[in-house]
Amino acid sequence: MATFARMKLCLSGSSQAIPSKGISLVAARFQSTASRASYVTPPYEKLMGKLQQVRKFLPGQKLTLAEKVLYSHLVNPEESFSGVSPSDIRGSLYLKLNPDRVAMQDASAQMALLQFMTCGLEKTMIPASIHCDHLIVGHRGANSDIPDSIANNKEIFDFLQSAAKKYGIQFWGPGSGIIHQIVLENYAAPGGMMLGTDSHTPNAGGLGMIAIGVGGADAVDAMTNTPWELKAPKIIGVNLTGAMSGWTTPKDLILHLAGKLTVRGGTGHIIEYFGPGVASLSCTGMATVCNMGAEVGATTSIFPYTDSMRRYLIATHRAEVADAASEVHSEYNYLAADTGAKYDQIIDINLSELTPSLNGPFTPDLSTPVSKFGEAIEKNKWPKKLSAGLIGSCTNSSYQDMTCVVDVVEQAISAGLKPKVPFLVTPGSEQIRATIERDGITERLEEAGATVLANACGPCIGMWKRTDDIASGEPNAILTSFNRNFRSRNDGNPSTMNFLTSPVIVAAKIFSSDLAFDPTHDTLQTPDGKAFKFRPPQGVELPSAGFIAGDSSYIPEPNPQPVPETEVTIDPKSDRLEALEPFEPYQGGEMENLKVAVKVKGKCTTDHISAAGKWLKYKGHLSNICNNTLIGAMNAATGEVNRAYDNGKGMTIPELMWKWKKDGQPWLVVAEHNYGEGSAREHAALQPRAMNGRIILTKSFARIHETNLKKQGVLPLTFVNEADYEKIDAEDKVSTRGIEQLLEGVLDQPITLVVTKKDGSVVEIPCKHTMSKDQIEFFKAGSALNLIREKAHSGVVNQKVIDSIKQQPDHYADAYIFNRHFVIAKGDQLGLPFHLKGVQVGDTIRLDKIASFGSRDFTLFGNPYVDPSLFTIEAVVLSFPKSALSVRVKHKRRHRHDRVMKHKQTYTILRVTELKLN
């Protein structure tokens, strides 16, 4: 378990010891395991201390598991909850959180790092990792696909690797595996919290972790130690009873739930599973369920701590994490909901009654039981012939998945059957690949005709070069164990219908050319004319001989230190990478005379807004990737895809946006429900912003995309009355009323759009927003990154500094003072938002918890802290002022108001009097 370092303080001229601000009981509990420290173990002592503070402000409140983990990661529980009613938290209160780590995949890491590099910091402030999985094409097999992809993406991989080295980020190279499988195997831990620049980051919920998909700007928040803001989600409780049997798998649980909730049903919620049925699920099975929670719009999903989680941790060489998790759960019931905890909605599912499902096409929530799939094919006139079967993706590429698949395949091969269609299999990681190869699974799959692809995303993210004769635009059906099936997503063909199902259903159906074949009941004819029926498959949860690492060169250093002198170059002539220019700050006042660039009809996912596939290569070049903006969107007026008009002249949507940017014409987009559904890709927000888009107006947003828009300085608005969607059209002129008040911090009034039609008539459309006070600051600054950069350059990120650090100080220190982060220089004054007990005005305090110490000429980095004998840093206590605490209250009319309570908050004001190298 991690050693819990404490700040050492001594009073000048006094022998009085100052206790750490924390919970001493918790500290005592965990000292016994400190010798087995692991940097991936959550800081349980700190988390329990935060949770105990939370319970003081929410006395008697029964907490769900999700709330426990979120609240234990609050920056300041007192600031968040003092004077707040429990009923005003979920769905209303913005939480400021400190995640434990960040993970980034290679497509999104490019933009995240380009943004981080502008902040001027020498290292990431929390552990971070980069995973090269999105840029590898699935074609002929791993042995040729990996070298080809490395050659084609050398510039990007070199950039990511050098940036990782410079800033102390772990780098998992191409072929190492899919980000979420590697996170599950190495970083996920019960009760921890992480952010990932991919929408399927919630996969780690299978290990009891709060793991949330975000855009790159949110990752920059975490990497710069800026508290990450999240509106407190509501909680959907899923009560599981019974146990699965036969052909039913964990994939069928989430496919069934997607059918019930729809793609919007989880928006603004965390899905928390509980009940006796949980114990019957494997850890990787629970990860599958959490992974696809993204498909219903959920913020994340989580399971309580179980024996299968402990077994998985031990099997993946993290016994110390398992021991620490078991201990904290035993002592504090941290990793399960409190008895009597309330949920905003409860869904009961009897696992014994579940049957296999197939979801699709073109949306992951159209769920059909396998027994009724044949009828659905006839009714909807879907293709009757299967064209390919694909197994893998971050959702279903575990060891257990592979053993289930090979059992099905061996049954068919033993009966003399052969696959009727191309059959592709993707292991989730190098560890999975090496282990299934050792155990003979790979050989048996290849003997059956399977093509084993690289340990990467491949076809799931559109990086699939098909080897069959399906022509572009030809209707065809594929079966996959993937998580998402939007039009054109997998192979670029808008007529390819992807039906999502479990790996075992895919494996069985490839032995029939009939898409309607039901392996749970139907039979196939063998070459000798006999009827063959599959028996229910049997898999193995964990390898009996243990996992093996495979190629150890993929494994990065456990805790890499930054190498500041590393050169990270961007060729100005490159068409793959482009340095970022800051967006202009908002100039104030109302927006006047915007024009509607396009009014979108129907589903508009991030795949429609910023397609992947062949466009992935431009993820690091904003100007180039802007050329795919909304190319999948349907024009509501004409029914055309990727078509817009300017005074009757037709052009592509990006062409119009570039034209209007050149003309100085700001614009907006109008769309329908769940705009931005799907991937976490922030390019879908960056691109409109870069081309002078200022407002996106919809019936509703997907959570991640709405946040990404706010981060980039684009104002997301929704209709107060959805019927008003019909009152606004492409090329209408739009001005705002109410933004001036918003900029002043007035949050509770709508913004009105004054729309001037082509015939000169005027209509007013009231709109809602969900901007917080911090998000308004992003908007005013031009983007969240502009604000972070400004704070970083002033010497501190998101902490109260009364006097900013001096320009170019002789020496500075990166200090942690009672878990609050400051970059300090001699003469600075600092405010700690609590009373520092045991000291008096005039006392001198020595600061020893220093992450780095440096000057204009050098920097010393600690591991995690610099040896205190190398420097002297002292601060004198100036005063203990009190400031009124402003809290949110509700009046009878249910309007929100800010009111100053009689309660006072005491601060400790320090001045840094000495800061020198010994």
From Swiss-Prot:
GO terms for biological process: lysine biosynthetic process via aminoadipic acid; mitochondrial translation; tricarboxylic acid cycle. The keyword Lyase applies. It comes from Schizosaccharomyces pombe (strain 972 / ATCC 24843). PANTHER family: ACONITATE HYDRATASE B, HOMOCITRATE DEHYDRATASE, MITOCHONDRIAL. It catalyses: (2R)-homocitrate = cis-homoaconitate + H2O. This is Aconitase-ribosomal protein bL21m fusion protein. The lineage of its organism: Eukaryota, Fungi, Dikarya, Ascomycota, Taphrinomycotina. Coiled coil: none annotated. One of its GO terms (molecular function) is structural constituent of ribosome. Keywords: 4Fe-4S, Amino-acid biosynthesis, Iron, Iron-sulfur, Lyase, Lysine biosynthesis, Metal-binding, Mitochondrion, Nucleus, Transit peptide. Its EC number is 4.2.1.-. InterPro entries: Acnase/IPM_dHydase_lsu_aba_1/3, Acoase/IPM_deHydtase_lsu_aba, Aconitase/3IPM_dehydase_swvl, Aconitase/IPM_isomerase, Aconitase_4Fe-4S_BS, Aconitase_4Fe-4S_dom, Aconitase_dom2, Aconitase_mito-like. One of its GO terms (cellular component) is mitochondrion. It comes from the Eukaryota. Residues 812-918 are annotated as: Large ribosomal subunit protein bL21m. [4Fe-4S] cluster binds at C394, C457, C460. Its cofactor is [4Fe-4S] cluster. Residues 31-811 are annotated as: Homocitrate dehydratase, mitochondrial. Residues 1-30 form a transit peptide.
